[in-house]
Protein backbone atom coordinates (compact mmCIF):
# COMPACT_ATOMS: atom_id res chain seq x y z
CA UNK A 1 0.00 0.00 0.00
CA UNK A 2 1.51 3.29 -1.06
CA UNK A 3 1.23 6.63 0.70
CA UNK A 4 -0.73 9.45 -0.88
CA UNK A 5 1.19 12.40 -2.25
CA UNK A 6 -0.05 15.93 -1.64
CA UNK A 7 -0.68 17.89 -4.78
CA UNK A 8 -1.49 21.56 -4.42
CA UNK A 9 -1.66 22.28 -8.16
CA UNK A 10 -4.72 24.20 -9.25
CA UNK A 11 -6.46 23.81 -12.59
CA UNK A 12 -7.24 26.80 -14.75
CA UNK A 13 -10.33 25.61 -16.58
CA UNK A 14 -10.86 28.87 -18.40
CA UNK A 15 -7.60 28.62 -20.34
CA UNK A 16 -8.30 27.80 -23.96
CA UNK A 17 -5.55 25.33 -24.81
CA UNK A 18 -7.16 22.84 -27.13
CA UNK A 19 -6.08 19.83 -29.12
CA UNK A 20 -7.90 17.70 -31.65
CA UNK A 21 -8.98 14.17 -30.81
CA UNK A 22 -7.32 11.39 -32.76
CA UNK A 23 -8.93 8.04 -33.51
CA UNK A 24 -8.90 5.86 -30.40
CA UNK A 25 -6.61 2.87 -30.78
CA UNK A 26 -6.73 -0.25 -28.64
CA UNK A 27 -3.49 -0.69 -26.68
CA UNK A 28 -1.26 -3.36 -28.17
CA UNK A 29 -0.60 -5.74 -25.28
CA UNK A 30 -0.23 -8.91 -27.29
CA UNK A 31 3.00 -8.95 -29.30
CA UNK A 32 4.46 -11.97 -27.57
CA UNK A 33 1.26 -13.98 -27.91
CA UNK A 34 0.87 -13.83 -31.70
CA UNK A 35 2.21 -16.77 -33.67
CA UNK A 36 4.19 -16.25 -36.86
CA UNK A 37 2.59 -19.07 -38.87
CA UNK A 38 -0.67 -21.04 -38.63
CA UNK A 39 -0.61 -24.78 -39.27
CA UNK A 40 -2.42 -25.84 -42.39
CA UNK A 41 -5.85 -27.25 -41.57
CA UNK A 42 -5.65 -29.55 -44.59
CA UNK A 43 -2.62 -31.31 -43.08
CA UNK A 44 -4.60 -31.96 -39.92
CA UNK A 45 -7.47 -33.45 -41.95
CA UNK A 46 -5.09 -35.74 -43.84
CA UNK A 47 -3.45 -36.85 -40.62
CA UNK A 48 -6.79 -37.62 -39.02
CA UNK A 49 -7.92 -39.57 -42.09
CA UNK A 50 -4.73 -41.69 -42.12
CA UNK A 51 -5.08 -42.38 -38.42
CA UNK A 52 -8.68 -43.49 -38.93
CA UNK A 53 -7.70 -45.84 -41.77
CA UNK A 54 -4.96 -47.40 -39.62
CA UNK A 55 -7.46 -47.86 -36.81
CA UNK A 56 -9.87 -49.64 -39.14
CA UNK A 57 -7.11 -51.94 -40.41
CA UNK A 58 -5.99 -52.81 -36.88
CA UNK A 59 -9.55 -53.49 -35.89
CA UNK A 60 -10.00 -55.80 -38.93
CA UNK A 61 -6.85 -57.76 -38.12
CA UNK A 62 -8.05 -58.32 -34.59
CA UNK A 63 -11.49 -59.55 -35.66
CA UNK A 64 -10.13 -61.68 -38.42
CA UNK A 65 -12.90 -60.68 -40.83
CA UNK A 66 -12.94 -58.89 -44.15
CA UNK A 67 -12.98 -55.12 -44.38
CA UNK A 68 -16.67 -54.75 -45.29
CA UNK A 69 -17.81 -56.67 -42.21
CA UNK A 70 -15.50 -54.64 -40.05
CA UNK A 71 -16.82 -51.33 -41.38
CA UNK A 72 -20.42 -52.42 -40.81
CA UNK A 73 -19.58 -53.40 -37.23
CA UNK A 74 -17.83 -50.07 -36.63
CA UNK A 75 -20.87 -48.22 -37.99
CA UNK A 76 -23.13 -50.10 -35.58
CA UNK A 77 -20.79 -49.28 -32.70
CA UNK A 78 -20.80 -45.59 -33.70
CA UNK A 79 -24.59 -45.51 -33.72
CA UNK A 80 -24.69 -47.01 -30.26
CA UNK A 81 -22.05 -44.58 -29.08
CA UNK A 82 -24.02 -41.59 -30.37
CA UNK A 83 -27.17 -42.80 -28.66
CA UNK A 84 -25.33 -43.19 -25.37
CA UNK A 85 -23.80 -39.72 -25.62
CA UNK A 86 -27.18 -38.19 -26.37
CA UNK A 87 -28.67 -39.87 -23.35
CA UNK A 88 -25.81 -38.66 -21.18
CA UNK A 89 -26.29 -35.10 -22.42
CA UNK A 90 -29.95 -35.20 -21.52
CA UNK A 91 -29.10 -36.30 -17.99
CA UNK A 92 -26.60 -33.45 -17.37
CA UNK A 93 -27.68 -30.77 -14.89
CA UNK A 94 -28.58 -27.41 -16.44
CA UNK A 95 -25.86 -25.53 -14.51
CA UNK A 96 -22.36 -26.58 -13.36
CA UNK A 97 -22.52 -24.16 -10.38
CA UNK A 98 -22.83 -25.86 -7.00
CA UNK A 99 -24.38 -24.36 -3.88
CA UNK A 100 -21.06 -23.08 -2.54
CA UNK A 101 -20.22 -21.28 -5.80
CA UNK A 102 -23.74 -19.89 -6.04
CA UNK A 103 -23.41 -18.39 -2.57
CA UNK A 104 -20.01 -16.91 -3.49
CA UNK A 105 -21.40 -15.47 -6.72
CA UNK A 106 -24.25 -13.81 -4.84
CA UNK A 107 -21.81 -12.21 -2.43
CA UNK A 108 -19.58 -10.82 -5.21
CA UNK A 109 -22.55 -9.38 -7.10
CA UNK A 110 -23.92 -7.79 -3.92
CA UNK A 111 -20.83 -5.58 -3.70
CA UNK A 112 -21.04 -2.09 -5.25
CA UNK A 113 -20.30 -1.80 -8.99
CA UNK A 114 -17.07 -0.51 -10.48
CA UNK A 115 -16.87 3.28 -10.20
CA UNK A 116 -18.76 3.55 -6.90
CA UNK A 117 -15.70 4.02 -4.65
CA UNK A 118 -13.91 7.36 -4.17
CA UNK A 119 -10.50 8.36 -2.84
CA UNK A 120 -10.40 11.20 -0.30
CA UNK A 121 -6.98 12.76 0.37
CA UNK A 122 -5.55 15.65 2.35
CA UNK A 123 -7.38 14.63 5.54
CA UNK A 124 -6.31 15.97 8.95
CA UNK A 125 -4.41 13.32 10.90
CA UNK A 126 -6.92 13.36 13.77
CA UNK A 127 -9.91 12.47 11.56
CA UNK A 128 -11.50 9.07 12.29
CA UNK A 129 -13.76 6.79 10.26
CA UNK A 130 -16.85 8.08 12.06
CA UNK A 131 -15.96 11.64 11.06
CA UNK A 132 -15.73 10.53 7.43
CA UNK A 133 -19.00 8.63 7.67
CA UNK A 134 -20.75 11.71 9.03
CA UNK A 135 -19.25 13.77 6.19
CA UNK A 136 -20.30 11.38 3.41
CA UNK A 137 -23.69 10.20 4.68
CA UNK A 138 -25.15 13.57 3.71
CA UNK A 139 -24.34 12.76 0.07
CA UNK A 140 -25.80 9.25 -0.18
CA UNK A 141 -25.90 5.69 1.13
CA UNK A 142 -22.46 4.37 2.13
CA UNK A 143 -21.31 0.78 1.74
CA UNK A 144 -17.93 1.01 3.48
CA UNK A 145 -15.42 3.53 4.87
CA UNK A 146 -11.72 2.61 5.09
CA UNK A 147 -9.31 5.07 6.67
CA UNK A 148 -5.73 4.12 5.80
CA UNK A 149 -3.47 3.81 8.86
CA UNK A 150 0.22 3.17 9.44
CA UNK A 151 0.79 -0.51 10.10
CA UNK A 152 3.25 0.07 12.95
CA UNK A 153 1.99 3.17 14.74
CA UNK A 154 -1.70 2.94 13.86
CA UNK A 155 -1.77 6.65 12.98
CA UNK A 156 -3.85 7.92 10.08
CA UNK A 157 -2.02 8.36 6.76
CA UNK A 158 -4.25 11.27 5.78
CA UNK A 159 -6.36 9.55 3.14
CA UNK A 160 -9.27 7.12 2.92
CA UNK A 161 -11.52 5.18 0.55
CA UNK A 162 -15.30 5.46 0.73
CA UNK A 163 -17.49 3.00 -1.18
CA UNK A 164 -21.02 4.12 -1.99
CA UNK A 165 -23.90 1.91 -3.09
CA UNK A 166 -24.10 3.40 -6.60
CA UNK A 167 -21.89 5.12 -9.17
CA UNK A 168 -24.16 8.17 -9.30
CA UNK A 169 -23.67 8.85 -5.59
CA UNK A 170 -19.90 8.46 -5.99
CA UNK A 171 -19.90 11.03 -8.80
CA UNK A 172 -21.96 13.37 -6.66
CA UNK A 173 -19.46 12.95 -3.81
CA UNK A 174 -16.58 13.96 -6.11
CA UNK A 175 -18.40 17.12 -7.16
CA UNK A 176 -19.28 18.12 -3.59
CA UNK A 177 -16.16 17.05 -1.68
CA UNK A 178 -13.28 17.98 -4.00
CA UNK A 179 -11.56 21.18 -2.75
CA UNK A 180 -13.93 21.28 0.23
CA UNK A 181 -12.74 22.68 3.59
CA UNK A 182 -12.90 19.95 6.25
CA UNK A 183 -11.61 20.51 9.79
CA UNK A 184 -9.27 23.26 8.66
CA UNK A 185 -7.82 21.47 5.59
CA UNK A 186 -8.74 21.40 1.90
CA UNK A 187 -9.48 17.81 0.90
CA UNK A 188 -9.24 16.16 -2.51
CA UNK A 189 -11.73 13.65 -3.89
CA UNK A 190 -11.56 11.49 -7.02
CA UNK A 191 -12.59 8.04 -8.22
CA UNK A 192 -10.71 5.17 -6.63
CA UNK A 193 -8.37 3.58 -9.16
CA UNK A 194 -9.41 -0.09 -9.20
CA UNK A 195 -9.50 -2.44 -12.19
CA UNK A 196 -12.33 -4.55 -13.54
CA UNK A 197 -11.00 -5.60 -16.97
CA UNK A 198 -8.90 -8.68 -17.77
CA UNK A 199 -6.60 -9.50 -20.67
CA UNK A 200 -6.71 -13.20 -21.62
CA UNK A 201 -4.16 -14.63 -24.06
CA UNK A 202 -3.35 -18.02 -25.61
CA UNK A 203 -6.97 -18.65 -26.61
CA UNK A 204 -7.52 -21.35 -29.27
CA UNK A 205 -7.72 -19.42 -32.52
CA UNK A 206 -10.56 -21.51 -33.94
CA UNK A 207 -12.92 -20.57 -31.09
CA UNK A 208 -15.95 -18.42 -31.77
CA UNK A 209 -17.06 -15.69 -29.40
CA UNK A 210 -19.99 -17.84 -28.22
CA UNK A 211 -17.65 -20.71 -27.33
CA UNK A 212 -15.31 -18.38 -25.47
CA UNK A 213 -18.20 -16.65 -23.70
CA UNK A 214 -19.58 -19.96 -22.41
CA UNK A 215 -16.22 -20.85 -20.84
CA UNK A 216 -15.72 -17.40 -19.28
CA UNK A 217 -19.22 -17.22 -17.82
CA UNK A 218 -18.76 -20.66 -16.25
CA UNK A 219 -15.56 -19.46 -14.52
CA UNK A 220 -17.11 -16.64 -12.50
CA UNK A 221 -19.92 -14.08 -12.22
CA UNK A 222 -20.28 -10.48 -13.31
CA UNK A 223 -19.21 -10.71 -16.97
CA UNK A 224 -20.47 -7.54 -18.65
CA UNK A 225 -18.63 -7.45 -21.96
CA UNK A 226 -16.38 -9.81 -23.93
CA UNK A 227 -14.18 -8.56 -26.77
CA UNK A 228 -12.60 -11.50 -28.61
CA UNK A 229 -10.23 -9.92 -31.13
CA UNK A 230 -10.87 -11.27 -34.64
CA UNK A 231 -8.21 -12.05 -37.21
CA UNK A 232 -8.54 -9.31 -39.88
CA UNK A 233 -7.33 -11.68 -42.60
CA UNK A 234 -9.72 -14.50 -41.63
CA UNK A 235 -12.92 -13.50 -39.84
CA UNK A 236 -13.70 -17.12 -38.92
CA UNK A 237 -10.68 -17.17 -36.59
CA UNK A 238 -9.54 -15.01 -33.68
CA UNK A 239 -6.07 -13.61 -32.89
CA UNK A 240 -5.66 -15.62 -29.71
CA UNK A 241 -6.52 -12.98 -27.12
CA UNK A 242 -9.50 -11.15 -25.65
CA UNK A 243 -10.57 -8.49 -23.15
CA UNK A 244 -13.26 -9.23 -20.55
CA UNK A 245 -15.04 -6.50 -18.57
CA UNK A 246 -16.57 -7.37 -15.17
CA UNK A 247 -19.21 -5.81 -12.91
CA UNK A 248 -16.61 -4.89 -10.28
CA UNK A 249 -13.05 -5.59 -9.19
CA UNK A 250 -14.10 -8.43 -6.88
CA UNK A 251 -15.76 -10.39 -9.72
CA UNK A 252 -12.79 -9.80 -12.02
CA UNK A 253 -10.23 -10.90 -9.43
CA UNK A 254 -12.25 -14.01 -8.52
CA UNK A 255 -12.19 -15.15 -12.17
CA UNK A 256 -8.54 -14.15 -12.55
CA UNK A 257 -7.51 -16.31 -9.59
CA UNK A 258 -9.35 -19.32 -11.03
CA UNK A 259 -7.90 -18.93 -14.53
CA UNK A 260 -4.27 -18.58 -13.41
CA UNK A 261 -4.51 -21.97 -11.71
CA UNK A 262 -2.20 -24.48 -13.41
CA UNK A 263 -5.10 -26.93 -13.87
CA UNK A 264 -7.21 -24.45 -15.84
CA UNK A 265 -6.93 -24.97 -19.61
CA UNK A 266 -8.57 -23.69 -22.77
CA UNK A 267 -8.67 -26.78 -24.99
CA UNK A 268 -5.26 -27.78 -23.65
CA UNK A 269 -3.84 -24.24 -23.71
CA UNK A 270 -2.70 -22.62 -20.46
CA UNK A 271 -4.12 -19.08 -20.79
CA UNK A 272 -2.26 -15.89 -19.96
CA UNK A 273 -4.44 -13.83 -17.60
CA UNK A 274 -3.47 -10.32 -16.43
CA UNK A 275 -5.10 -7.03 -15.59
CA UNK A 276 -5.80 -5.02 -18.73
CA UNK A 277 -5.05 -1.33 -18.97
CA UNK A 278 -8.50 0.27 -19.00
CA UNK A 279 -9.76 2.55 -21.70
CA UNK A 280 -9.46 6.09 -20.45
CA UNK A 281 -12.51 7.80 -18.99
CA UNK A 282 -12.95 11.53 -18.30
CA UNK A 283 -14.08 10.80 -14.74
CA UNK A 284 -10.84 9.18 -13.56
CA UNK A 285 -9.19 12.13 -11.81
CA UNK A 286 -9.92 14.95 -9.43
CA UNK A 287 -9.13 17.56 -12.10
CA UNK A 288 -11.55 15.96 -14.56
CA UNK A 289 -14.26 16.00 -11.89
CA UNK A 290 -14.46 19.78 -12.41
CA UNK A 291 -14.76 19.72 -16.20
CA UNK A 292 -17.71 21.78 -17.45
CA UNK A 293 -16.93 21.58 -21.18
CA UNK A 294 -18.04 19.24 -23.96
CA UNK A 295 -15.99 18.00 -26.89
CA UNK A 296 -18.15 18.03 -30.03
CA UNK A 297 -17.00 16.29 -33.23
CA UNK A 298 -18.33 15.96 -36.82
CA UNK A 299 -19.53 19.57 -36.94
CA UNK A 300 -20.53 20.44 -40.54
CA UNK A 301 -18.64 23.17 -42.34
CA UNK A 302 -19.98 26.72 -42.02
CA UNK A 303 -21.77 25.89 -38.74
CA UNK A 304 -21.88 29.05 -36.62
CA UNK A 305 -21.23 29.25 -32.90
CA UNK A 306 -24.77 30.58 -32.50
CA UNK A 307 -26.17 27.36 -33.97
CA UNK A 308 -24.16 25.28 -31.51
CA UNK A 309 -25.16 27.48 -28.59
CA UNK A 310 -28.83 27.18 -29.47
CA UNK A 311 -28.47 23.39 -29.73
CA UNK A 312 -26.82 22.86 -26.33
CA UNK A 313 -28.25 25.62 -24.13
CA UNK A 314 -31.35 23.56 -23.32
CA UNK A 315 -29.26 21.77 -20.68
CA UNK A 316 -28.11 24.97 -18.95
CA UNK A 317 -26.29 28.27 -19.39
CA UNK A 318 -23.59 28.12 -22.10
CA UNK A 319 -20.74 30.50 -21.28
CA UNK A 320 -18.81 30.17 -24.54
CA UNK A 321 -18.31 28.12 -27.72
CA UNK A 322 -14.76 27.50 -28.96
CA UNK A 323 -14.09 26.15 -32.48
CA UNK A 324 -10.29 26.08 -32.96
CA UNK A 325 -8.85 25.48 -36.43
CA UNK A 326 -8.06 21.86 -37.22
CA UNK A 327 -5.42 20.23 -39.37
CA UNK A 328 -5.02 21.62 -42.86
CA UNK A 329 -7.20 24.61 -42.05
CA UNK A 330 -10.32 22.44 -41.77
CA UNK A 331 -12.32 22.28 -38.56
CA UNK A 332 -14.96 19.70 -37.66
CA UNK A 333 -14.80 19.87 -33.86
CA UNK A 334 -15.34 22.34 -31.05
CA UNK A 335 -15.83 22.85 -27.31
CA UNK A 336 -19.02 23.90 -25.52
CA UNK A 337 -18.51 25.44 -22.06
CA UNK A 338 -21.29 25.42 -19.45
CA UNK A 339 -21.57 27.50 -16.31
CA UNK A 340 -22.33 24.37 -14.24
CA UNK A 341 -20.87 20.85 -14.46
CA UNK A 342 -24.33 19.34 -13.97
CA UNK A 343 -25.36 20.84 -17.32
CA UNK A 344 -22.43 19.15 -19.07
CA UNK A 345 -23.31 15.80 -17.48
CA UNK A 346 -26.90 16.11 -18.70
CA UNK A 347 -25.67 16.84 -22.21
CA UNK A 348 -23.68 13.58 -22.48
CA UNK A 349 -26.40 11.22 -21.28
CA UNK A 350 -27.00 8.21 -23.54
CA UNK A 351 -30.52 9.39 -24.33
CA UNK A 352 -29.31 12.65 -25.89
CA UNK A 353 -28.83 12.91 -29.67
CA UNK A 354 -27.60 15.96 -31.58
CA UNK A 355 -27.77 16.88 -35.28
CA UNK A 356 -26.78 19.92 -37.33
CA UNK A 357 -28.14 20.13 -40.88
CA UNK A 358 -29.00 16.42 -40.72
CA UNK A 359 -25.48 15.39 -39.69
CA UNK A 360 -25.18 13.58 -36.31
CA UNK A 361 -22.64 14.94 -33.83
CA UNK A 362 -20.37 13.05 -31.43
CA UNK A 363 -20.52 14.58 -27.95
CA UNK A 364 -18.42 13.61 -24.90
CA UNK A 365 -16.91 15.34 -21.87
CA UNK A 366 -13.69 17.20 -22.61
CA UNK A 367 -10.46 16.13 -20.90
CA UNK A 368 -7.85 18.19 -19.04
CA UNK A 369 -4.58 18.71 -20.91
CA UNK A 370 -2.59 16.81 -18.26
CA UNK A 371 -4.54 13.63 -18.93
CA UNK A 372 -4.02 13.88 -22.66
CA UNK A 373 -0.25 13.57 -22.19
CA UNK A 374 -0.82 10.00 -21.07
CA UNK A 375 -3.67 9.30 -23.50
CA UNK A 376 -2.86 10.29 -27.09
CA UNK A 377 -6.39 9.42 -28.24
CA UNK A 378 -8.08 11.93 -25.93
CA UNK A 379 -9.42 15.42 -26.43
CA UNK A 380 -8.49 18.12 -23.98
CA UNK A 381 -7.96 21.65 -22.85
CA UNK A 382 -5.50 23.30 -20.45
CA UNK A 383 -5.15 21.83 -16.98
CA UNK A 384 -2.53 21.12 -14.34
CA UNK A 385 -1.22 17.67 -13.37
CA UNK A 386 -3.43 15.56 -11.13
CA UNK A 387 -2.55 13.25 -8.23
CA UNK A 388 -1.13 9.84 -9.02
CA UNK A 389 -3.32 6.76 -8.40
CA UNK A 390 -2.88 4.58 -5.36
CA UNK A 391 -2.53 0.82 -4.88
CA UNK A 392 -4.96 -0.37 -2.23
CA UNK A 393 -7.21 -3.28 -1.25
CA UNK A 394 -10.80 -2.83 -2.46
CA UNK A 395 -13.96 -3.45 -0.50
CA UNK A 396 -14.19 -6.87 -2.15
CA UNK A 397 -11.11 -7.98 -0.24
CA UNK A 398 -8.96 -8.41 -3.36
CA UNK A 399 -5.78 -6.50 -4.09
CA UNK A 400 -6.10 -3.92 -6.83
CA UNK A 401 -3.51 -2.24 -9.04
CA UNK A 402 -3.58 1.38 -10.23
CA UNK A 403 -4.70 2.28 -13.71
CA UNK A 404 -1.85 2.59 -16.10
CA UNK A 405 0.51 0.68 -13.78
CA UNK A 406 3.43 -0.94 -15.53
CA UNK A 407 2.86 -4.61 -14.92
CA UNK A 408 3.14 -7.98 -16.60
CA UNK A 409 4.92 -6.38 -19.53
CA UNK A 410 1.64 -4.97 -20.78
CA UNK A 411 2.06 -1.31 -19.89
CA UNK A 412 2.65 0.97 -22.85
CA UNK A 413 4.17 4.37 -22.20
CA UNK A 414 1.99 7.27 -23.23
CA UNK A 415 3.15 9.90 -25.67
CA UNK A 416 4.34 13.31 -24.51
CA UNK A 417 3.86 16.66 -26.17
CA UNK A 418 7.60 17.39 -25.89
CA UNK A 419 10.76 15.29 -25.33
CA UNK A 420 11.63 14.32 -21.79
CA UNK A 421 15.10 14.79 -20.29
CA UNK A 422 15.43 11.92 -17.88
CA UNK A 423 15.90 13.18 -14.34
CA UNK A 424 15.13 16.78 -15.33
CA UNK A 425 11.50 16.79 -16.51
CA UNK A 426 10.28 18.30 -19.76
CA UNK A 427 12.64 19.97 -22.22
CA UNK A 428 12.92 23.76 -21.65
CA UNK A 429 10.86 25.94 -23.95
CA UNK A 430 12.70 27.07 -27.08
CA UNK A 431 15.36 24.38 -26.88
CA UNK A 432 15.75 21.51 -29.31
CA UNK A 433 17.70 18.28 -29.50
CA UNK A 434 20.59 18.52 -32.01
CA UNK A 435 22.51 15.46 -33.27
CA UNK A 436 26.29 15.51 -32.84
CA UNK A 437 28.94 13.10 -34.15
CA UNK A 438 31.13 11.82 -31.30
CA UNK A 439 34.87 11.01 -31.76
CA UNK A 440 34.23 7.27 -31.54
CA UNK A 441 31.80 7.42 -34.46
CA UNK A 442 28.58 7.28 -32.47
CA UNK A 443 25.83 9.90 -32.76
CA UNK A 444 24.83 11.79 -29.61
CA UNK A 445 22.22 14.48 -28.92
CA UNK A 446 22.62 17.77 -27.08
CA UNK A 447 20.22 20.56 -26.07
CA UNK A 448 20.77 23.71 -28.10
CA UNK A 449 19.02 26.97 -28.95
CA UNK A 450 17.71 27.07 -32.56
CA UNK A 451 20.11 28.80 -34.94
CA UNK A 452 23.18 28.29 -32.77
CA UNK A 453 26.31 26.75 -34.34
CA UNK A 454 26.76 23.00 -33.98
CA UNK A 455 28.27 22.06 -30.63
CA UNK A 456 31.82 20.80 -30.90
CA UNK A 457 32.52 17.23 -29.92
CA UNK A 458 34.57 16.81 -26.75
CA UNK A 459 38.23 15.91 -27.33
CA UNK A 460 38.91 12.21 -27.27
CA UNK A 461 41.04 11.08 -24.36
CA UNK A 462 44.06 9.01 -25.39
CA UNK A 463 43.77 5.34 -24.68
CA UNK A 464 46.13 3.60 -22.30
CA UNK A 465 47.96 1.87 -25.15
CA UNK A 466 48.36 5.21 -26.96
CA UNK A 467 50.06 6.74 -23.93
CA UNK A 468 52.59 3.91 -23.80
CA UNK A 469 53.32 4.13 -27.51
CA UNK A 470 54.98 7.54 -27.16
CA UNK A 471 58.45 6.09 -26.58
CA UNK A 472 60.27 3.34 -28.39
CA UNK A 473 61.82 0.29 -26.84
CA UNK A 474 61.25 -1.23 -23.44
CA UNK A 475 58.11 -2.60 -21.93
CA UNK A 476 55.12 -0.57 -20.97
CA UNK A 477 55.99 -1.04 -17.29
CA UNK A 478 59.44 0.53 -17.78
CA UNK A 479 58.16 3.37 -19.92
CA UNK A 480 55.50 4.26 -17.38
CA UNK A 481 58.21 5.85 -15.19
CA UNK A 482 58.45 8.67 -17.69
CA UNK A 483 54.84 9.64 -16.86
CA UNK A 484 55.08 9.53 -13.09
CA UNK A 485 54.52 13.26 -12.94
CA UNK A 486 51.04 12.90 -14.45
CA UNK A 487 49.98 9.73 -12.66
CA UNK A 488 48.53 11.64 -9.72
CA UNK A 489 45.91 13.28 -11.96
CA UNK A 490 44.61 10.06 -13.53
CA UNK A 491 41.44 8.38 -12.33
CA UNK A 492 42.01 4.97 -10.82
CA UNK A 493 40.54 2.27 -13.07
CA UNK A 494 40.43 -1.10 -11.30
CA UNK A 495 39.40 -3.01 -14.46
UniProtKB/Swiss-Prot annotation:
Induction: Slighty induced upon pathogen infection (e.g. P.syringae). Rapidly recruited to chromatin upon methyl jasmonate treatment (MeJA) to mediate transcriptional gene activation. Disruption phenotype: Mild early flowering phenotype, reduced rosette diameter, abnormal floral developmental homeostasis and altered gynoecium growth determination associated with indeterminate ovaries growth. Production of ectopic inflorescences with severely affected flowers showing proliferation of ectopic stigmatic papillae and ovules in short-day conditions. Repression of FLC accompanied by an increase in histone H3 trimethylation on lysine 27 (H3K27me3). Altered expression of several genes, including LHP1-regulated genes. Keywords: Activator, Cytoplasm, Developmental protein, Endoplasmic reticulum, Microsome, Nucleus, Plant defense, Repeat, RNA-binding, Stress response, Transcription, Transcription regulation. Signal peptide: none annotated. It comes from the Eukaryota. Residues 11-46, 67-101 have a biased composition (Acidic residues). One of its GO terms (cellular component) is endoplasmic reticulum. GO terms for biological process: cellular response to jasmonic acid stimulus; defense response to bacterium; defense response to fungus; epigenetic regulation of gene expression; innate immune response; negative regulation of innate immune response; positive regulation of DNA-templated transcription; regulation of cell fate determination. GO terms for molecular function: chromatin binding; mRNA binding; sequence-specific DNA binding. Predominantly expressed in vascular and meristematic tissues. Expressed throughout development in seedlings, roots, leaves, floral buds and siliques. It is found in: Nucleus; Cytoplasm; Microsome. Residues 116-194, 196-278, 292-368 form the RRM domain. Residues 1-10, 478-487 have a biased composition (Basic and acidic residues). SMART domains: RRM (SM00360), RRM_1 (SM00361). Residues 1-101, 452-495 are annotated as: Disordered. Interacts with LHP1 in the nucleus on a common set of chromatin regions. Transcriptional activator that binds DNA on GAGA-like motif and 5'-(C/G)ACGTG(G/T)C(A/G)-3' consensus motif in the promoters of target genes. Component of ribonucleosomes, which are complexes of at least 20 other different heterogeneous nuclear ribonucleoproteins (hnRNP). hnRNP play an important role in processing of precursor mRNA in the nucleus. Required during flower development and for cell fate determination. This is Heterogeneous nuclear ribonucleoprotein Q.
